[in-house]
């Protein structure tokens, strides 16, 4: 499943839960045999991690794995959070499994239709007025947002538009003690024409918004494609970053030695800045059993 489709579906509350099983839609439709097979293929011994990193994982990368099964696997692996979830998935995850949702999905308008377009502001505010109080009530610390595509718009005009549109949303976030984070994405490979595609642009937007409750989601995969200099950028701009995502380059697959980034050094650099937020695995597994890849990724990043 592609990221855009996954985010759109989750924002509308369509996830791993099927209808007709109470308000949380918790009934799993996948065969039990599939779940058992996955349980056998990764180490079922509960992980004892170093405790320096708050580990999370993006559900959309494991779209064929029921949320219930993924949550159980996360508990075994020592992962504290499953993120970018729609509202229907929050309560089952948090109440039934004691896990966190580090980032709630935002407006159903999605990645391409964001705050850089003034015509979207009314709907974005309406959506966030619904999402933010509910997320905060469950202790979810962050809600994601996007700049939107350029569609011929000048970057500075788009930045000003974003700042104006974000102002009432961020004020609401401040009131509820929750953060709004805008994701940095690459516009070369995955999200052609996306505006918030360089760290410096994002940093300037954060300065314009001027609130401790608005930060960037620094996606290491995306920014390696766009600008490189990952560790230097993290050291320079860490105060503007509220969350991190991983992914192998090229290909957005496993973060092992099949790709060009050395994640132990990157994660150590993140920790050296004093970062205490979440680091989420957002690579697309290539193994027959994706949970093996997830477990490997956690070990690589557990510095």
Question: Model-found features: residue ranges?
Answer:
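Active-site acidic/histidine proton-transfer and metal-coordination neighborhood
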Residues: 10-18, 45-49, 116-215, 225
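Catalytic domains of carbohydrate-active enzymes, especially glycoside hydrolases
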Residues: 70-90
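Histidine-acidic metal/acid-base catalytic patches
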Residues: 2-75, 140-141, 196-218, 222-303
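Active-site-proximal loop/turn and secondary-structure-junction residues that shape catalytic pockets
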Residues: 61-63, 86-88, 107-109, 149-151, ...
């Amino acid at each position: 499943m592609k990221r855009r489709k996954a985010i759109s579906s989750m924002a509308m509350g369509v996830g791993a839960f099927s209808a007709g099983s109470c308000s949380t839609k918790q009934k799993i439709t996948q065969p039990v045999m599939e779940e058992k097979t996955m349980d056998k293929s990764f180490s079922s011994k509960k992980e004892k991690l170093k405790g320096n990193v708050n580990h999370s994982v993006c559900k959309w990368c494991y779209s064929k794995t029921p949320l219930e099964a993924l949550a159980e696997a996360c508990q075994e692996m020592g992962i504290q959070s499953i993120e970018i979830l729609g509202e229907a998935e929050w309560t089952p995850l948090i109440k039934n499994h004691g896990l966190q949702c580090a980032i709630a999905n935002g407006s159903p308008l999605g990645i391409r239709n964001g705050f850089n377009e003034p015509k979207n502001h009314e709907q974005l505010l309406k959506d966030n007025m619904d999402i933010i109080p509910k997320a905060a009530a469950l202790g979810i610390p962050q809600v994601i947002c996007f700049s939107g595509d350029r569609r011929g718009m000048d970057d500075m005009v788009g930045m000003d538009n974003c700042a104006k549109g974000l102002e009432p949303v961020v004020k609401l976030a401040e009131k509820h003690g929750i953060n709004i984070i805008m994701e940095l994405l690459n516009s070369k490979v995955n999200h052609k024409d996306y505006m918030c595609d360089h760290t410096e642009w994002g940093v300037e937007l954060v300065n314009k918004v001027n609130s401790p409750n608005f930060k960037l989601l620094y996606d290491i995969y995306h920014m390696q494609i766009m600008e490189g200099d990952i560790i230097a950028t993290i050291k320079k701009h860490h105060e503007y970053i509220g969350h991190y995502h991983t992914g192998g380059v090229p290909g957005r697959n496993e973060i092992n030695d099949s790709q060009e980034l050395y994640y132990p050094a990157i994660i150590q650099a993140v920790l050296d800045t004093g970062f205490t937020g979440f680091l989420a695995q957002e690579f697309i597994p290539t193994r027959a059993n994706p949970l093996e890849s997830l477990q490997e990724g956690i070990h690589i990043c557990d510095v």
